[in-house]
């Protein structure tokens, strides 16, 4: 599990704009199932935010 402020690389993401990019987690939410976490990652360009799950993130 990651936390707000963590530096990450986005991997295996279906959106080409996000895949392979680096950024910082700016917010997170827990899904209704109580197990899945959704992370908003602001890319280093400070213009783009990508929605990701655990499997799509890797610690920098």
Where are these regions (language model features)?
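Basic/aromatic-rich interaction segments and small domains that mediate binding to polyanionic partners
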Residues: 2-60
